[in-house]
Swiss-Prot record:
Keywords, alphabetical: Signal
Matches recorded under Pfam families: DUF2015
Organism: Eremothecium gossypii (strain ATCC 10895 / CBS 109.51 / FGSC 9923 / NRRL Y-1056) (Yeast)
Protein family membership: Belongs to the UPF0357 family.
Domain of life according to the entry: Eukaryota
Name of this protein: UPF0357 protein AAL017W
Keyword flag Signal: yes
Transmembrane segments: none
Keyword Signal: yes
InterPro entries in the cross-refs: DUF2015
Disulfide bridges in this chain: none
Signal peptide: 1-23
Coiled-coil features, chain-numbered ranges: none
PANTHER family for the chain: UPF0357 PROTEIN YCL012C
Length: 134
């Protein structure tokens, strides 16, 4: 009887240790998702959020990620987020290519760079341009 109880306790101890290891390895993702969930929950029920209204709408529309975090303290930020044309284009890229927000934003930015004569790495495509490397 004592051996079975000990094995049972060891099993659950190993399960809990495994859960803690996984949670520790993913703590940044868990922190971001929790923050995003709380902002959405507060805005849905009319509670106070510390981000301006433009960013709340962008967050609800899926225009946020860990790399483009809208849940940071930006209540005094006067910017209005992405303009409507950019949002529509990024949304279209996300739906057509099945990409997440970060990847769709990269595709959109790369296309905008190309339209203005800039390579995807940020270097000008103009053959007359002179650059200096360190």
């Amino acid at each position: 009887m004592f051996g079975l109880i000990s094995l049972w306790h060891l099993f659950w101890l190993a399960v809990m240790a495994g859960i803690l290891v996984v949670a520790h390895r993913n703590r940044e993702t868990i922190r971001y998702k929790t923050s995003e969930f709380m902002v959405r929950l507060r805005s849905r029920f009319g509670g106070y959020t510390s981000i301006n209204d433009h960013f709340v709408r962008d967050l609800e529309d899926g225009f946020s990620s860990q790399n483009f975090d809208l849940t940071s303290a930006n209540s005094n930020d006067t910017r209005s987020g992405l303009d409507e044309a950019s949002k529509q284009e990024i949304r279209r890229i996300m739906e057509e290519q099945g990409l997440g927000f970060d990847q769709a934003r990269l595709v959109y930015t790369t296309r905008k760079f190309g339209a203005h004569g800039i390579a995807p790495d940020g270097m000008p495509l103009d053959p007359k341009v002179v650059t200096f490397r360190r």
